[in-house]
């Protein structure tokens, strides 16, 4: 077992049983290709999502260090911040969130609904900033201030995307390989690529467990030139933690995130509506809608390595739908 070193790292069990891996019959008929979906949108806490896999490792480390406060950062409609706040509530910890308004909107629905509404329910302390220009440095400044107030803070990076958090998606690759074994030979895997931890963790895990499958990251905020070093650096950091080699090429498509992070586009919204109407599954306008737009266009443009089955990693995000009305 090449991933045996995973068990060396403390981990809290938030998810329990594997999330479903499902065939999408009506969507497959529509696209003329076998499409499967990994349902990380239905993880148990706070309306689900992929960040819970990372938080199993990060929160365990926070408790090991004796922290009483989790500090993290993201957009006003950040799924990661919402899930971090929920984990803090479950563990009896304080949570401080440094938020930015990445789309510069004054729309009350965006500023108060969706994920932002849930932060208040979790009793999160909100700190606003003009922009997360250097989030790691900004989080350290905030942590110093919180510590001076008598708390013991633990900083979780944007998206939970460091080598420790990304182990959650090495673990996910193991889960996927076990679910596919003897059932389906996945040719291609598609995932949204943002803060890069999910993408990099899958890259390390799938290289060792499903080496014949190509992994495509559809960017949601950056060009390939800007995103590639982020994914590669995390890929190598994860491999170092696990004492593995990681030589798989990182594949990125950056044609689907315009006009920018957090701003809906027509292709992404059409993908959201399509999956809702054909399969009753909810995507979101920021991450999974744009990633699914890439999958759909990738089939029509013959961008995949062959015509075999495709697995879409559903990372969650549906709470943001409420904040993006009337785009939806």
Swiss-Prot record:
Pfam families: PALP. It comes from the Bacteria. Keywords: Lyase, Pyridoxal phosphate. It catalyses: D-cysteine + H2O = hydrogen sulfide + pyruvate + NH4(+) + H(+). Homodimer. The modification N6-(pyridoxal phosphate)lysine is found at residue 51. GO terms for molecular function: D-cysteine desulfhydrase activity. It is an enzyme of class 4 (lyase). Its cofactor is pyridoxal 5'-phosphate. Belongs to the ACC deaminase/D-cysteine desulfhydrase family. Disulfide bonds: none annotated. The gene is dcyD. InterPro entries: ACCD_DCysDesulf (IPR027278), D-Cys_desShydrase (IPR005966), D_Cys_desulphydr_bac (IPR023702), TrpB-like_PALP (IPR001926), TrpB-like_PALP_sf (IPR036052). This is D-cysteine desulfhydrase. Its EC number is 4.4.1.15. One of its GO terms (biological process) is D-amino acid metabolic process. Catalyzes the alpha,beta-elimination reaction of D-cysteine and of several D-cysteine derivatives. It could be a defense mechanism against D-cysteine.
